Amino acid sequence: MVPAQHRPPDRPGDPAHDPGRGRRLGIDVGAARIGVACSDPDAILATPVETVRRDRSGKHLRRLAALAAELEAVEVIVGLPRTLADRIGRSAQDAIELAEALARRVSPTPVRLADERLTTVSAQRSLRQAGVRASEQRAVIDQAAAVAILQSWLDERLAAMAGTQEGSDA
């Protein structure tokens, strides 16, 4: 296994590892809260699900595993917040550790890491543009960031799958 501090983000749409049709779960890991999003069964559109509070007892891991089971997720995508200098900081290490712990709970469902630089900033901007006041953003910002992480993964996956299709049609 690759040491956590050297683990790069995964790439969507790899035919050897893509689970095919089915819902994907997107997760934005924060220090206090975890945003959760889910895709439709065709893996085209990400929508918010809920915000899970973190705690020391691991209840948040149980809830995330329960959501993966309830939603019949075929893949779980955890945001990896690398620095702009492409390094792993404390937040990224936390995301990797949560992904590894969750992977043990949801096996054999794969848990992937997705590059998520600036998704919270992007989510805040989108909420602000939608007219959501700053005081109201806290309740949904984690879910919005999870949607951004998952939607990016889904879009990259579709593009990669289309490229694979074109290559096999030639």
UniProtKB/Swiss-Prot annotation:
Keywords: Cytoplasm, Hydrolase, Nuclease, Ribosome biogenesis. One of its GO terms (biological process) is rRNA 5'-end processing. It comes from the Bacteria. Residues 1-25 are annotated as: Disordered. One of its GO terms (molecular function) is nuclease activity. Was identified as a high-confidence drug target. This is Putative pre-16S rRNA nuclease. It comes from Mycobacterium tuberculosis (strain ATCC 25618 / H37Rv).
